[in-house]
């Protein structure tokens, strides 16, 4: 018989840097999850992606055990890394803060494809291009 899911917790944590301090501790603690076990597992599975923010979806079962699914980093984080900028523009329509190439855009779209609501890479590229535009990042050929 399958275990019954009591809660689904969604968090965005920097890869390899999960610790029991807020926001992780309180979010998991209120469901009775072993926080240190989660932190160790998360850090082990994200060690190769250090520095990126990795969203995670944690399913908590009635016996207080848990499983978690790692998602792909947010498109905005990947765009910032590709453009070499700290943050997006406050006025994206007036002030442009960086540039990325079409090749970089395609690479980001391929990374994000499993989590996006798109059937092919071209549709994913359009979604990521929209995010870049809203951040004040220009796409160049």
Swiss-Prot record:
Function: Forms part of the ribosomal stalk which helps the ribosome interact with GTP-bound translation factors.
SUPFAM superfamilies named in the record: Ribosomal L11/L12e N-terminal domain, Ribosomal protein L11, C-terminal domain
Post-translational modification: One or more lysine residues are methylated.
InterPro entries listed in its UniProt record: Ribosomal_uL11 (IPR000911), Ribosomal_uL11_bac-typ (IPR006519), Ribosomal_uL11_C (IPR020783), Ribosomal_uL11_C_sf (IPR036769), Ribosomal_uL11_CS (IPR020785), Ribosomal_uL11_N (IPR020784), Ribosomal_uL11_N_sf (IPR036796)
Gene name linked to the record: rplK
HAMAP family: Ribosomal_uL11 (MF_00736)
Keyword terms, alphabetized: Methylation, Ribonucleoprotein, Ribosomal protein, RNA-binding, rRNA-binding
SMART domains named among the record's database cross-references: RL11
Subunit structure: Part of the ribosomal stalk of the 50S ribosomal subunit. Interacts with L10 and the large rRNA to form the base of the stalk. L10 forms an elongated spine to which L12 dimers bind in a sequential fashion forming a multimeric L10(L12)X complex.
This protein's GO CC annotations: cytosolic large ribosomal subunit
Organism: Cyanothece sp. (strain PCC 7425 / ATCC 29141)
GO MF, any single term: large ribosomal subunit rRNA binding
Protein family: Belongs to the universal ribosomal protein uL11 family.
Record protein name field: Large ribosomal subunit protein uL11
Tagged with keyword Ribosomal protein: yes
Annotated GO biological process: translation
Transmembrane segments: none
């Amino acid at each position: 018989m399958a275990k019954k899911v009591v809660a689904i917790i969604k968090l965005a944590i920097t890869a390899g840097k999960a610790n029991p301090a807020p926001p992780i501790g309180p979010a998991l603690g209120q469901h009775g999850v072993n926080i240190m076990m989660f932190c160790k597992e998360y850090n082990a599975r994200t060690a190769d992606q250090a520095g990126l923010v990795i969203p995670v979806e944690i399913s908590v079962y009635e016996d207080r055990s848990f499983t978690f699914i790692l998602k792909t980093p947010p498109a905005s984080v990947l765009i910032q890394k590709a453009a070499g900028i700290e943050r997006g523009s406050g006025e994206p329509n007036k002030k442009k803060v960086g540039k990325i190439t079409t090749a970089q855009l395609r690479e980001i779209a391929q990374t994000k494809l499993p989590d996006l609501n798109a059937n092919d890479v071209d549709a994913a590229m359009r979604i990521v291009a929209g995010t870049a535009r809203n951040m004040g990042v220009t796409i160049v050929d």
